[in-house]
Amino acid sequence: MAGSRTNDIKVYCSFCGKSQDDVKKIIAGNNVFICNECVALSQEIIKEELAEKVLADLTEVPKPKELLDVLNQYVVGQDRAKRALSVAVYNHYKRVSFTESRDDDDVDLQKSNILMIGPTGSGKTFLAQTLAKSLNVPFAIADATSLTEAGYVGEDVENILLKLIQAADYNVERAERGIIYVDEIDKIAKKGENVSITRDVSGEGVQQALLKIIEGTVASVPPQGGRKHPNQEMIQIDTKNILFIVGGAFDGIEEIVKQRLGEKVIGFGQNSRKIDDNASYMQEIISEDIQKFGLIPEFIGRLPVVAALEQLNTSDLIRILTEPRNALVKQYQALLSYDGVELEFDKAALEAIATKAIERKTGARGLRSIIEETMLDIMFEIPSQEDVTKVRITKAAVEGKSKPVLETA
């Protein structure tokens, strides 16, 4: 029961001793009373303790080698990118820990947000997810193509922050130490190097809007998402310690690199540098190339760490299918084991799955759908066939020319 009187008897707060006449409201419980002032004080104490806990959780930041070891357990290949990410993430959270305890005269450490460049299915999103999971920090994913600048139909950039707050169970202090991955960042590049006289709703304007939250600001976020409205209650979140990782395929950027290095698409330059393939050109990318592609200089400047990922080949995809701790083959073997059935993939079948993924240009993200297509009928029938003890997936089964081989007791 809440109120200021109980049977016309004056009541007092059990914590501070103030009477009902000295405070706005007293809440009555089971033989105990608490005033609105003590409730507010309790909330403040809890908030401070939660903030201290969040900071304490980040004081022991895994070292770059430890982060790399975690990535190696789940991510195949991309060794150079994994090293760059491990160092950048370590430095970021050391900076967060340092900033919280620094004196005014100490060096001001800048954020090291990350730009990942690599083809579809090369593992950009999965790398970011794995890092966040290993650090036990909130993680949110956003698609840059869904964003528009304020005043236009679409999603405000502040809604990215809402996703992170939701991932932190609305614990703002914890969200302020989280990681946000923005995918398809190349899709909001300016159309050409010259600024258009028409309004670029999902291009440079979105880059400018993202720039503010990436570099660090106190943003007002609508708790239910959507557009902001007058008199709407907002969640205030400081983005200065949020790590932003942005990624995109940047199709065609290798041609920009070739031109900068002096190697023409047609003919040969006398001073050209010869590099074997496009994958190697990706490792040569500098900020000048990214700017020429269409990202504005201010935006590039807030992404000092650039990690280039390579196109995955057949061998890489086969390793992804079989080697990581959560490899897809292991997952499907576990699924069938619950029905008492052993699952085996022929080597040729794994090669066929990898080849299909490359042909579809889906990379690693397309592997699961190919296995699902191959095993749909098997997973439907096996639970009802108690005499089946083993399923063998062949190359012909992957190619749709025959059914998987069944062995019975």
Curated annotation (Swiss-Prot):
Q: Which biological processes are named by the entry's GO terms? A: cell division; proteolysis involved in protein catabolic process
Q: List UniProt keywords, sorted A-Z.
A: ATP-binding, Chaperone, Metal-binding, Nucleotide-binding, Zinc
- Which annotated residues bind Zn(2+)? 13, 16, 35, 38
Q: Which Pfam families match?
A: AAA_2 (PF07724), ClpB_D2-small (PF10431), zf-C4_ClpX (PF06689)
Family recorded in the similarity comment: Belongs to the ClpX chaperone family.
Tell me where in this chain the ClpX-type ZB domain is found: 1-54
Q: Does the keyword Membrane apply?
A: no
| Name under which the protein is recorded | ATP-dependent Clp protease ATP-binding subunit ClpX
Residues noted as binding ATP in the record, renumbered to the chain: 119-126
